[in-house]
UniProtKB/Swiss-Prot annotation:
It is found in: Cell membrane. Disulfide bonds: none annotated. The lineage of its organism: Bacteria, Pseudomonadati, Pseudomonadota, Gammaproteobacteria, Vibrionales. It comes from Vibrio cholerae serotype O1 (strain ATCC 39315 / El Tor Inaba N16961). Its main location: membrane. InterPro entries: Gly_transporter. Belongs to the UPF0126 family. GO terms for cellular component: plasma membrane. This is UPF0126 membrane protein VC_2382. The chain crosses the membrane at residues 38-58, 62-82, 86-106, 122-142, 153-173, 185-205. It is a multi-pass membrane protein.
Length: 239
């Protein structure tokens, strides 16, 4: 069994150059706009980062390779799947483009090979990986929503769903309290990032500039919440 697992991992690692080459060809196609290329690369980056966060949590919980793959996959593509179904964008993105699945599998293999003892990692690594994936996916969600409709409000909601959906499924499967339900600022960072993104577009900035403004604003707010334990006032009913 051990040899078979190693063989499978090596096959995934060997497949990495092919997957990366396919992604590169998509991005340098002369007929593809710069904004589309940037969006695709950022989407792949967010997929990989969110997959890492799923692998690290699975490692801390001592899951088997199948459990690791499931947790990484739902984290990386869960939110986007919900978004596409809500927008009627079917078949969903990872069925139309299997590079997403390859990125997840390769990321799982590399993370399991390189990170031997997830329990000994610094406490902040998982939240920071989650924050990076969150920021990227909020931007992706807003952009994709605006392709299918014109409402800024719906775009922001789709951004929040894309960013938070996979993490919620991951935490529920792992029997953890979802990060979005904890006291620290989480969904609020997504909303503010979506507002920055849609406002920049309304002001006439390019899609790339608007996307990056939303991503970085979400990321900075979320990292600040992690560092200084920022939270919103709680609602509590007293007896």
């Amino acid at each position: 069994m051990h040899k078979s697992s190693n063989f499978s991992g090596l096959n995934l690692v060997k497949s990495a150059p092919i997957c990366l080459l396919d992604i590169f060809h998509r991005c340098v196609d002369s007929e593809t706009a710069l904004d589309t290329s940037l969006l695709y690369l950022i989407d792949m980056f967010g997929t990989a980062v969110f997959a890492v966060s799923g692998v690290l949590l699975a490692g801390r919980l001592k899951m088997d390779p199948f459990g690791v793959m499931v947790l990484a996959s739902v984290t990386a593509i869960g939110g986007g799947t919900i978004r596409d179904m809500a927008l009627g964008a079917t078949p969903v993105f990872w069925i139309k483009d299997t590079n997403y699945l390859w990125v997840i599998m390769i990321t799982c293999a590399l993370t399991m090979l390189l990170v031997r003892r997830p329990k000994r990692l610094a406490w902040w690594i998982l939240p920071v990986c989650d924050a990076i994936g969150l920021a990227v996916f909020v931007g992706i969600g807003v952009e994709k929503a605006l392709i299918y409709q014109d409402s800024a409000l719906i775009a922001i909601i789709m951004g929040v769903i894309t960013g938070c959906g996979g993490g919620i499924i991951r935490d529920v499967l792992a029997r953890e309290i979802p990060m979005v339900l904890r006291s620290e600022v989480y969904a609020t960072a997504c909303i503010i990032g979506g507002i920055f993104h849609t406002t920049a577009l309304a002001m006439g900035y390019s899609s790339s500039t608007a996307l990056l403004s939303g991503v970085f604003s979400t990321l900075l707010i979320r990292l600040g919440a992690i560092r200084w334990h920022l939270s919103l006032p709680t609602f509590a009913l007293t007896k």
